[in-house]
Amino acid sequence: YIFNDFMLTKEGAATLDEIAVRVYATVVSTPSKEYAVLDGGTKTFYMDIVPETPPYYYPGYAVVAGNDDLQLLRMNEEHGILTSKKGDTGLHVGDIVELIPIHVCTTINQQNEVYLYDGETLRKEKVAARGMLV
């Protein structure tokens, strides 16, 4: 796999540091301190896994980088709901959240473009096989 993903960490084939893909979502609403609404839902994070079930007990549809307390357990097409194990997410409207996809193949397949960073330069590329089966 060229990107690695969280699934591969459960298999022992990759570490979090070896996952090359990040999705950045913006907090668009915080109706309660217990949850925050992101501008990334099922059109961004695929639902081909069931969080918190055997055999791997994935912590959600994506992992919040650097924050094991936050979980992405609910989504609709356009929005994801981040909750906190501790009760208060600490997030505010406008905050940018860095997420690691559980399954990168389906995440990339749903995007029109990706941004590539080589340590110096950031460039935008079209996803050539976007929406394709192969």
Tell me the role of every PLM-derived stretch.
Residues 1-134:
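Active-site anion/phosphate-binding pocket segments in diverse small-molecule metabolic enzymes
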